[in-house]
Regions:
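Flavin (primarily FAD) cofactor-binding/catalytic cores of flavoenzymes
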Residues: 2-21, 62-327
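Conserved N-terminal glycine-rich FAD pyrophosphate-binding loop of Rossmann-like flavoproteins
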Residues: 19-47, 197-209
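Dinucleotide-binding Rossmann-like beta1-alpha1 core, especially the glycine-rich loop
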Residues: 31-82
Length: 327
């Protein structure tokens, strides 16, 4: 929304649809989670659009943190909520959900819970949801609970054995959180070796798939170093996997995220987003964690770019194209 305004789109012609306007899942679910992004990059994002008016923002805790440090996502959510308020005051903010899309007469018809609106262009930033595995006999601890020490402390885990699936940033936060509680045992089921991000100066090796910050530090000491008491690791392809899985009472799935379904578009069937430029259809575009950019690094390794500043970088490159590739 901010970048559209910065590119000269009249605020009065922008309809922003969101059920809450509280900085999405980041503001609602992930505030207690340590980031894998430096404070400096968050500040770059917050100051990256004139329409954000961040120069006029009140003082936030984020302003007091060292630029090269990581932080809690809650430190970022607070200024994002403030910016949301600034943008909502400029555009038509509709507190609802989009449920359907159709293209007629060169304009997109967007069905919402409040009725229909039409537009020449539609940008989807629908977000993603955690993936799950099919072990229904295990009591699931939602990932947003496992990553929040206060919420996790409310779980009745005394004497329990907890399975943690995955070896991601989220995994390396959930594991120490669980080990700090009363669980009798924690078993980490994994598929391969850990991957760490390495700053190479002008680029970062494994920038989007490697461990960073506190998660990387903990993993080096406790996974690739000396396993803590009560923590066991098991390769999912090993013969021990079925028996160890059967011994578990609870499960935490830290195995990635899937894009939320986009509004139904029976006219087109299954729509796909071009990972190179964000185009879904003429006048229909995708941005954010549900539609990340795919980039190949100098070594030839490719990964999807996920992070607020990376979404901003993507918009800076693609928005001029989108504004010409209308319906």
């Amino acid at each position: 929304v901010g970048k559209l305004i910065d590119h000269g789109v009249l605020p009065a012609s922008i309809a922003w649809i969101d059920p809450e306007f509280t900085a999405g899942d980041l503001g609602a679910k992930w505030r207690a989670v340590p980031s894998n992004t430096s404070v400096k990059l968050f500040i770059n994002y917050l100051t990256g659009a004139d329409s954000f008016r961040f120069a006029h923002a009140p003082h936030f805790a984020l302003n007091d943190l060292a630029p090269t440090d990581t932080c809690l996502l809650g430190d970022v959510a607070d200024p994002l909520v403030w910016i949301t308020g600034q943008l909502c005051a400029q555009v038509s903010a509709l507190r609802t959900r989009a449920t359907g899309l159709a293209l007629h007469g060169g304009r997109w018809e967007v069905q919402t819970e409040l009725g229909e609106i039409t537009s020449k262009n539609v940008i989807l930033a629908v977000g993603s949801v955690p993936k799950k595995l099919a072990y229904p006999w295990l009591n699931e601890i939602p990932i947003e609970v496992a990553l929040d020490p206060a919420k996790l402390a409310e779980q009745p885990l005394e004497g329990a054995t907890v399975a943690v699936f995955g070896a991601s940033h989220s995994s390396m936060i959930a594991l120490p959180n669980l080990l700090a509680g009363p669980a009798a045992k924690v078993i980490n089921f994994y598929r391969g070796p850990l991957r760490y991000a390495v700053d190479m100066g002008e680029w970062t090796l494994f920038d989007d798939t490697g461990l960073k910050g506190e998660a990387a530090r903990w993993a080096r000491e406790n996974i690739d170093g000396v396993l803590p008491d009560r923590l066991q690791r098991c390769l999912v392809d090993s013969p021990e996997f079925p028996e160890l899985l059967e011994s578990c009472d609870y499960a935490v799935y830290t195995v990635g995220f899937s894009p939320r379904p986009i509004p139904a578009a029976p006219q087109w069937g299954q729509l796909e987003c071009n990972a190179a430029n964000g185009i879904i259809a003429p006048g229909l575009f995708g941005v954010g964690i549900a539609f990340p950019e795919y980039r190949i690094d100098p070594t030839g390794f490719g990964e999807y770019r996920v992070g607020l500043q990376k979404f901003m970088d993507r918009l800076n490159k693609t928005l001029p194209l989108w504004l010409k590739y209308g319906s």
